[in-house]
A protein has these predicted regions:
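Extracellular glycan-binding segments that recognize GlcNAc-based cell-wall polysaccharides
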Residues: 27-170
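N-terminal signal peptide c-region/cleavage motif recognized by signal peptidases
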Residues: 23-25
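Bacterial N-terminal signal peptides that target proteins for export
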Residues: 1-12
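Solvent-exposed hydroxyl-ligand-binding patches built from regularly spaced Ser/Thr
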Residues: 171-292, 296, 300-309
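Bacterial N-terminal signal peptides
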Residues: 11-21
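Feature targets compositionally biased, intrinsically disordered low-complexity regions
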Residues: 1, 41, 59-64, 78, ...
Length: 309
């Protein structure tokens, strides 16, 4: 009983520290959204205010760093995300639904105004509800696999509540990629083994490959012909202005693979997390032997597997 009371007091104390006014000026320009975790009641909170973030960390919250960036242009803005506080449980709730925001306010939740803006496209934030908990009953995640797993465990899935704009990141390792016959090459029609420098970056949910120097990206069909600027076969990519762009989603990974030389072409396609795990296990079993030159990129832009023949 004493331990329970002590934890409740700590929980309440941490929650009270978070009762500060949200600075509306912070919405004027793009800023990172910071995530915090209250280990005493399981509450997660997001804030645009770095000073608030630092203050809560000093008060005992666990700072979990940058979650995403709030959009700064009106054209990228889907709407506002509102923040509420439950004085009885210490929980913070985030919603774009003003009706829900207003209804909970009338039910006794503290309405804390606009927390940040939701992006039109980006990383969806999924909301879950645990009916058995008395504090920290809601959880938000940008990982669809985690969302699905928790629903199977009994959490109530409440769908996407807002979207975050992922900051631009550079792909690790993908700065020089060896390629071969009938594949994606850099401005040269020689049919022997070629090499090209390709840089890659992710902004929002788009992966862009850009050739270095004055080279252009060409897509070669199995017979050595150029596919020009048409959408690439067997892919979700499009050529535009010498760059190659692909849409990424949070629940999938990207595969760039090169098949046998006799009938090969570069294939960019999406795979699910289960398939990604199978490929990782297969890599561990066979080492570096295999039929593909392959790069696997997760939705956050990290190269999780790199195999070159």
């Amino acid at each position: 009983m004493r331990e329970h009371a002590r934890r409740w007091v700590l929980c309440a104390a941490l929650a009270l520290v978070a009762l500060v006014a949200l600075p509306q000026a912070a919405l004027a320009e793009a800023k990172p959204v910071w995530r915090l975790y209250n280990r005493y009641d399981g509450d997660h909170m997001w804030t645009l205010d770095k000073a608030e973030y630092d203050s809560l960390v000093k008060a005992g919250w666990t700072g979990e760093g940058k979650a995403w960036e709030a959009p700064h242009k009106e054209s990228m803005n889907e709407g506002f995300v509102y923040r509420l506080y439950n004085p009885w449980s210490g929980e913070h709730l985030f919603t774009m639904d003003y009706g829900e925001y207003d209804q909970l306010g009338k039910a006794g939740w503290r309405k804390e105004g606009t927390a940040f803006e939701s992006a039109k496209v980006g990383a969806p934030a999924w909301r879950l509800y645990n009916r058995w908990l008395t504090a920290g009953t809601h959880l938000y995640t940008t990982d669809k696999a985690e969302y699905d797993r928790l629903v199977k465990l009994g959490w109530v899935g409440e769908g996407v509540r807002f979207c975050g704009k992922l900051p631009e990141s550079r792909l690790k390792q993908l700065t020089y990629y060896r390629i071969g016959l009938n594949s994606l090459i850099g401005g040269d029609d020689h049919l022997d083994m070629l090499s090209t420098g390709v840089s890659a970056s992710i902004r929002g949910d788009t992966l862009t490959l850009t050739p270095k120097g004055d080279r252009a990206l060409l897509v070669k069909d199995p017979f050595g012909g150029s596919a020009g600027d048409e959408t690439i076969i067997n892919s979700a990519g499009e050529l535009s202005g010498g760059k190659l762009s692909f849409r990424l989603t949070e629940s999938t990974a990207y595969v760039v693979e090169y098949d046998a030389p006799t009938d090969a072409m570069f294939i960019f396609r999406m795979i699910g997390r289960e398939e990604l795990e199978k490929r990782r296990q297969w890599r561990g079993n066979v080492g570096t032997l295999g039929r593909y030159d392959e790069v696997i990129v997760d939705a956050r832009g990290n190269v999780v597997s790199l195999l070159l023949r």
